Amino acid sequence: MMSGDYLVIDKRVLPDVYEKVLFAKKLLKDGKVKEITEAVKIAGISRSVYYKYRDFVFDFAETSEGRKVTYNIIFKNEKGLLSNISNYITEKGGDILTINQGIPLNGYANLSITIDLSTVDGDIKTLTEGLLNIRNVEKVEFIGME
């Protein structure tokens, strides 16, 4: 019985649509195209396929430096909360590589954070759930993994 929401699967056994979605995302990320319409045309998929899978398909790579994950976190703008988030990550063994907080609007702040997972105690699911359990953290969105 499997637990968790993520699987690592060799792309050779999956329909090619998933790899095409990744290709379209890469075209956009690298700035080779500016519009989704252009990216999906080059990748050979429909816009509906792109929108259906874009938030669920990620490229996975193991590097010599370790695994890196990027999150987008929405939290109530409260004194000390950013510190609580960073303390939680370091307590779990994570190394914060980049952190960028947007200007708080309507009482909420947006945080983009990249973490080196190579020394984290536990798995990515546990880390994500722990971030969600921090008081006044409203949303933790998994952006990607390298």
UniProtKB/Swiss-Prot annotation:
InterPro entries: ACT-like_dom_sf, ACT_dom, UPF0735_ACT_dom-cont. PROSITE patterns: ACT. Residues 70-145 form the ACT domain. Gene3D superfamilies: 3.30.70.260. Belongs to the UPF0735 family. NCBIfam families: PRK04435.1. This is UPF0735 ACT domain-containing protein Cbei_1295. It comes from Clostridium beijerinckii (strain ATCC 51743 / NCIMB 8052).
